[in-house]
């Protein structure tokens, strides 16, 4: 795997994501992992629609799924998702349970990905009414990766993006089109650098 972008959003971020994922070229290499802080039913319906309009393969991430380039994996907040090494590859460890504290679902996915892939990770936060994702962005930055947020002006709910925007002095002013462009640039820049688990 050469590069992974982890995107976090709340239930108010679907419209933002619809402007980003379809704009990406699967030839850019690497994978996209998305954590949506919404119910699994809503996320599954959204994934079916997004897969139909994208060049990327868009799927619901499952436990044991091997991370593959040119794919977009989407998870709901009812899952605790960690990326882990397995037999020279990276796989998802997904634990679904109503008893899991899902207040840090985005953080968990970002932190586990950054700890494995170091500077080959970008973290992105979109619209959301929750504060999840801030710790994940911090970990990605500390490992040498890149972190971006959607300009709060483009967010229906600004809580998820406004805190990190101030705290980490992140590159602001990015709308969905610019975010898609930055994500592609990160992936293309690392396309030839493959890392194994």
Q: Model-found features: residue ranges?
A:
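Conserved acid/base catalytic micro-environments in cytosolic active-site loops
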Residues: 1-197
